[in-house]
Amino acid sequence: MFASISPYYGVSFFEFFIVFFSRLFSGKLFYDHLYIDDIQVIVFFAIAVSCSIIGTFLVLKKMAMYANVVSHTILFGLVCACLFTHQLTHLSMQNLTIAAISTTLLTGASIHFIRNVFKVAEEASTALVFSLLFSASLLLLVFLTRNAHVGTELVIGNADALAKTDIFPVFLVLLXNLGVSYCFFSSFICVSFDTVFAFSLGIRVKLIDYLMMFLLSASIVGAFKAVGVLMSLAFLLVPGLIAKLIASSVQEMMGYSMIFGVLSALIAPALSRSILSVHGIGLSTSGLAVCLLLVFYIGTLATVFVRRHILLQSKN
């Protein structure tokens, strides 16, 4: 019955955008009249913008590996929260946020502890903490939540299960990212490029690092239901990596990062719906979004390479 009343039922790729924007500009896109396709676009849009903001600074600070570790180890905190609260399928945003922030701080503290006490390289301590916490989370998922669906949803997400109640949390995370980044924008830039120089200017480097970790964990929590803990890494890093190839300033980099993230967020639901309508095949919307980001990155990388090759040939 839901399909028969949905305006997106049976539409093609371009018809999807016609229906969506006609509903948007005609005022029919009210909270009480949202369909699953509308919710996917809105939630994916908020996730893309939110992750692009903090992702830009993570790429500039060369914290891609740390973000990768956190996106995996945070699964440990989420599973522990499920077990302690005895809620294997539904967790409140408050519990998720506390679990994510706690695991992020635990990851960072463990890396620094192993590096300083055992005098090993940071890469080695990072790999050790990553392997330990992620393997522990997988063991908990296999042995303690075998009869629940929490494992699949935490890892790869379930965009088709999004509801209206999921809109508020992701926009709350977006507002937090926008607010903190606006207030500490210059400090974020200084710390991202040179921590010694930032410290000489009187910037509290550790405070900025903790703020970045807070925004990182909040962004992952905001994205985990739609795209999963692991796939959220793509939204955090890939748009920033694409923007870094073509931008000449931090502002441009953040702008390009948002553009590519939003494009992926808009195209993925439309592509998923059109494939289902035309071919009758249901594909993961979050998986399509990540694949689109990969295509954008490869295309941008190839374009930059060709342009540089042409410039070198013209000079010779």
UniProtKB/Swiss-Prot annotation:
Q: Where in the cell is it found?
A: Cell inner membrane
Record keywords: Cell inner membrane, Cell membrane, Membrane, Transmembrane, Transmembrane helix, Transport
Cite a single Pfam family from the UniProt record: ABC-3
Membrane topology of this protein: Multi-pass membrane protein
Q: Name one GO biological process term.
A: response to zinc ion
Main subcellular location of this protein, as a coarse class: membrane
Question: Is Mitochondrion among this UniProt entry's keywords?
Answer: no
Against PANTHER family, the record matches this protein to:
ABC-TRANSPORTER METAL-BINDING PROTEIN (PTHR30477), METAL TRANSPORT SYSTEM MEMBRANE PROTEIN CT_070-RELATED (PTHR30477:SF8)
Q: What is this protein called?
A: Probable metal transport system membrane protein TC_0342
Classification from the root reads: Bacteria, Pseudomonadati, Chlamydiota, Chlamydiia, Chlamydiales
